From Swiss-Prot:
It comes from Escherichia phage If1. It is found in: Virion; Host membrane. It is a single-pass membrane protein. Its main location: virion. The chain crosses the membrane at residues 9-29. GO terms for cellular component: host cell membrane; membrane; virion component. Pfam families: Inovirus_G7P_2 (PF19978). Belongs to the inovirus G7P protein family. Coiled coil: none annotated. The keyword tRNA processing does not apply. May initiate with G9P the virion concomitant assembly-budding process, by interacting with the packaging signal of the viral genome. The assembly-budding takes place at the host inner membrane. In turn, G7P and G9P are present at the end of the filamentous virion that emerges first from the bacterial host. Keywords: Host membrane, Membrane, Transmembrane, Transmembrane helix, Virion. This is Tail virion protein G7P.
Amino acid sequence: MSATDFDSLYQLIFNAGLVICFGLGVISGGQR
């Protein structure tokens, strides 16, 4: 696995984490 593959994979995971955190925040905020 090359450094570029690892970098793009890390970026994908990081972006997914941001989306999930943001989504959970919106969902929990809307339930209040």
